[in-house]
């Protein structure tokens, strides 16, 4: 019995252990399946939320195309291009997915959100491909021309400086929740015991000045701030959220004054004269894997705070001319040209010279112009080219300069392929951007002492320097230029005097109006005004004119924007540390008291206003603090912004493998020629001006301070003539269809490197080498890529049908849906389908036919009754009249009267002919 009892107990224990083991294993399996399904569900839910918000945004924009509000206009022109948009959408889906999981996290253990789960979320959301390093090509071409995306400039860090990567952080960001919420998001959050002042209050009390009160710069021309804006658009664009509606709840950001991501509205004071309590503001897109997304990587909430993305290459590479992605570059190039030209406008000329081509988007209309005749915006490497005529003029100058250079290079080197001529011209244009910026522009901004301290002489490429544009530079320091924008656009005649037919214009009358350039004199009057009229001087107490603080992007009476408030709010959105933190970063003393602040600002009244608003010196927004500082000697910035701008410019120069002064980028002789060139020379070669100042940025009087274009030095392009002997065994082949090649040397041998146009895939050898027997392989071919076959990352939204075309694809909508502004999503147009109109028309015809038939039947019946009561003679007469009237256009009634020789009597019966 004891043995049986012991065996029974043993069996029970073993059974219990096995049962518990089974239960635990099953729980792990079940929980694993539950977590996986939960992740998939969270991502699917988030994708629906984000896409629904984006869809509603595009639908609202479609309905409001006639009159855009300033906020809509700003949002539209900060829309990311295709690649940037895909990254922004993926980041928003990933961030929303993690928010969904955080809200439901009580159902799961905290440690369940592992790196594996996060990898799954990154993959399902579409973020993962944009977080991996790109593959760098290993060809001689990779060392000859910079890639359009900026990737692989640094071979060890291929994403440094590339487009669609996160802005660099020189100091950790400050977010109210530690990783994502902007400064000022929570109204009860205190900084050193005080809430931050509303940005609109800061603008009104410290920044804004009337147009009449501005002081003009006695040293520098209006070209100085315009060049600064142009260069800023070459190196930085922070895309806004792809949606202007909240992801949770879908409320329109223009209709809410609550903080609901991505809505972060600018609150207006209670005594504001406007009809709304806030101005719309949309948060910048997060970079993939940061903010709420980064909060769960390793479960370290502060390990990877929210970062913002730069949609452009960081490098000074003339991306304003060529774009920062293959898709944009494809739109800009003239693929039918054998000389590697850029596309030009086919509808308008400027005294025989080219304008920028038109984009598909319509800009602000000329008064009284119907929508169908609205002038489109200009198409350039940067989407903001049409903001103001001066900016469009500079873009146009460089379009013309590229085509001038490419044509000359092709004439000098007839054996060059179209792609070689294009790349060589692009290389020179990029070098000229670097020279004009670093030699002529930046020293005037920093002053000689700060330039020597922070930039200094060039000592060669340094692969340890990260050239990525920093958040503080893009979001604060380089926005100093907004305080130098003049409220007037001055257009001058050939004598550089006020143009009688082209009067001065206020800025509000030129925003996004390219028709003013085309229909009102072309480039020359604008360029003369930039050269011969002064910039606005940045003066404490006169920081920004009211055209920018009260009338920004105003096209109608449907609202306004305030650029100063936008700058301050953007800094808080990006979590920029305060003014004193950045002074300490630059080795400058912290300023804690009004007396200390007055040493840097040197304006007691402004210091008092700052302290009244901010209450504590460590609360001051960095953009305001840097802007308010007194200038350094010979500079146009104070010490803080001189430090930040100088450090950034040095990084852009020293961290760029393709910097024009770097060894092997150009020959020694070519570098000497490049140094001769200047912005005035570019103006001489590409406008109708015959006299220019030697320095385009210095204000001068005409004619004594202007030189003849014949005396302005220029490059000798003969230095680009290729003289290497071409072996008869290796004659340059014909260019491949839908592709091109460039040539270079590798180990002393001639090499051809082939590439296909965007939308085509290379099949065969990418690189062909010249040997003793000729080319070592046949040229490759370029095959069309069927983008529609990609089911993993479909190019069109599910609402659209994908149609493959040669080198591209089209997203097609069924009536009454139309493509949204992303050209991938079908939006309900709000009108009846064409088929419905056809049905209505057919129905109307059917009803009309039935009515006519009914009328004829009734008339016949009535006529038959009348025939029975008429005398024989009357009946015969009437029918006779009807027969006579046929074919002559005479009414039967009148014909009957003619037969009797009488006019028809009033009120007599009119008989119907059969």
UniProtKB/Swiss-Prot annotation:
Transmembrane segments: 835-859
GO process annotations (BP): embryonic hemopoiesis; hormone biosynthetic process; hydrogen peroxide catabolic process; response to oxidative stress; thyroid hormone generation
Broad class of the protein's primary localization: membrane
Protein purpose: Iodination and coupling of the hormonogenic tyrosines in thyroglobulin to yield the thyroid hormones T(3) and T(4).
UniProt source species: Mus musculus (Mouse)
CDD domains: CCP, EGF_CA, thyroid_peroxidase
Name listed for the protein in its UniProt record: Thyroid peroxidase
Membrane topology category: Single-pass type I membrane protein
Designated gene of the protein: Tpo
């Amino acid at each position: 019995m004891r043995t049986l009892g012991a065996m029974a107990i043993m069996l029970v224990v073993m059974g219990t252990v096995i049962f518990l083991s089974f239960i635990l294993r099953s729980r792990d399996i079940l929980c694993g399946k539950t977590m996986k399904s939960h992740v998939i569900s969270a991502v699917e839910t988030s994708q629906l939320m984000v896409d629904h918000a984006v869809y509603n945004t595009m639908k609202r924009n479609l309905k409001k195309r006639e009159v855009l509000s300033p906020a809509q206009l700003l949002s539209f022109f900060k829309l990311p291009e295709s690649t940037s948009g895909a990254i922004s959408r993926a980041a928003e889906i990933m961030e929303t997915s993690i928010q969904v999981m955080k809200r439901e996290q009580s159902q799961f253990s905290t440690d369940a959100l592992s790196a594996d789960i996060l990898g799954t979320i990154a993959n399902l959301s579409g973020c993962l491909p944009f977080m991996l390093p790109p593959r760098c090509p290993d060809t001689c071409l990779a060392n000859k021309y910079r890639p359009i995306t900026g990737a692989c400039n640094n071979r060890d860090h291929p994403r440094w400086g590339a487009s669609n990567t996160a802005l660099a952080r020189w100091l950790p960001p400050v977010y109210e929740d530690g990783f994502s919420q902007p400064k000022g998001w929570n109204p009860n959050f205190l900084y050193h015991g005080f809430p931050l002042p509303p940005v609109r209050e800061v603008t009104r009390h410290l920044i804004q000045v009337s147009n009449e009160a501005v002081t003009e710069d006695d040293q520098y021309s209006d070209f100085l701030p315009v060049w600064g804006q142009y260069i800023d658009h070459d190196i930085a664009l922070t895309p806004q959220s792809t949606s202007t509606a909240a992801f949770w709840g879908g409320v329109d950001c223009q209709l809410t004054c609550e903080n609901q991501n991505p809505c972060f509205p600018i609150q207006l004071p209670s005594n504001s004269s406007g009809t709304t309590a806030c101005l719309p503001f949309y948060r910048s897109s997060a970079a993939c894997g940061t903010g709420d997304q980064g909060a769960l990587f390793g479960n370290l909430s502060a390990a990877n705070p929210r970062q913002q993305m730069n949609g452009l290459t960081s490098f000074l590479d003339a991306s304003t001319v060529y774009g920062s992605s293959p898709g944009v570059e494809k739109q800009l190039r003239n693929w039918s040209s054998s000389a590697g030209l850029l596309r030009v406008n086919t509808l308008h000329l400027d005294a025989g010279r080219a304008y920028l081509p038109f984009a598909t988007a319509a800009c602000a209309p000329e008064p009284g112009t119907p929508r169908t005749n609205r002038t489109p915006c200009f198409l350039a490497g940067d989407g903001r080219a049409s903001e103001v005529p001066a900016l469009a003029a500079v873009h146009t100058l460089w379009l013309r300069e590229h085509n001038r250079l490419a044509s000359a290079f092709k004439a000098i080197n007839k054996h060059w392929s179209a792609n070689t001529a294009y790349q060589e011209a692009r290389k020179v244009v990029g070098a000229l951007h670097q020279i004009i910026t670093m030699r002529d522009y930046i020293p005037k901004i920093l002053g000689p002492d700060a330039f020597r301290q922070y930039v200094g002489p060039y000592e060669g490429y340094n692969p340890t320097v990260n050239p990525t544009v920093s958040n503080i530079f893009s979001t604060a320091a380089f926005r100093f230029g907004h305080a130098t924008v003049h409220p007037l656009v001055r257009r001058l005649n050939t004598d550089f005097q006020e143009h009688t037919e082209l009067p001065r214009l206020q800025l509000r009358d030129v925003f996004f109006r390219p028709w003013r350039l085309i229909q009102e004199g072309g480039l020359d009057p604008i360029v003369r005004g930039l050269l011969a009229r002064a910039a606005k001087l940045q003066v404490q107490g006169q920081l920004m004119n009211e055209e920018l603080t009260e009338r920004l992007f105003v096209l109608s009476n449907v609202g306004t924007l305030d650029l100063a408030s936008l700058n301050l709010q953007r800094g808080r959105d990006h979590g920029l540390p305060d003014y004193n933190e950045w002074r300490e970063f630059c080795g400058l003393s912290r300023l804690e008291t009004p007396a200390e602040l007055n040493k840097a600002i040197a304006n007691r009244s402004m210091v008092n206003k700052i302290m009244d608003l901010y209450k504590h010196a460590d609360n001051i927004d960095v953009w305001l603090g840097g802007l308010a500082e007194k200038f350094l000697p010979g500079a146009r910035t104070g010490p803080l912004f001189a430090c930040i701008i100088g450090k950034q410019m040095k990084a852009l120069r020293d961290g760029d493998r393709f910097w024009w002064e770097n060894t092997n980028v150009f020959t020694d002789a070519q570098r000497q020629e490049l140094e001769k060139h200047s912005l005035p020379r570019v103006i001489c070669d590409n406008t109708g001006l015959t006299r220019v100042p030697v320095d385009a940025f210095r204000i001068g009087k005409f004619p004594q301070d202007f030189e003849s274009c014949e005396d302005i030095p220029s490059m000798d392009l003969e230095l680009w003539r290729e003289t290497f002997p071409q072996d008869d065994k290796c004659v340059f082949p014909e260019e491949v269809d839908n592709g091109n090649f460039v040539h270079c040397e590798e180990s002393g041998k001639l090499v051809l490197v082939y590439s296909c146009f965007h939308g085509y895939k290379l099949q065969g050898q990418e690189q062909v080498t010249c040997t003793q027997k000729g080319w070592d392989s046949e040229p490759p071919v370029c095959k069309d890529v069927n983008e529609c076959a990609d089911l993993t990352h479909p190019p069109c939204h599910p609402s659209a049908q994908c149609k493959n075309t040669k080198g591209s694809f089209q997203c097609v909508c069924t009536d009454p849906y139309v493509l949204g502004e992303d050209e991938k999503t079908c939006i309900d147009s709000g009108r009846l389908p064409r088929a419905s109109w056809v049905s209505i028309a057919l129905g109307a015809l059917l009803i009309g036919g039935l009515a006519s038939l009914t009328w004829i039947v009734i008339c016949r019946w009535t006529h038959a009754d009348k025939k029975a009561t008429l005398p024989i003679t009357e009946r015969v007469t009437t029918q006779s009249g009807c027969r006579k009237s046929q074919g002559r256009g005479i009414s039967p009634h009148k014909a009957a009267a003619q037969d009797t020789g009488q006019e028809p009597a009033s009120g007599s019966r009119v008989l119907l002919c059969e």
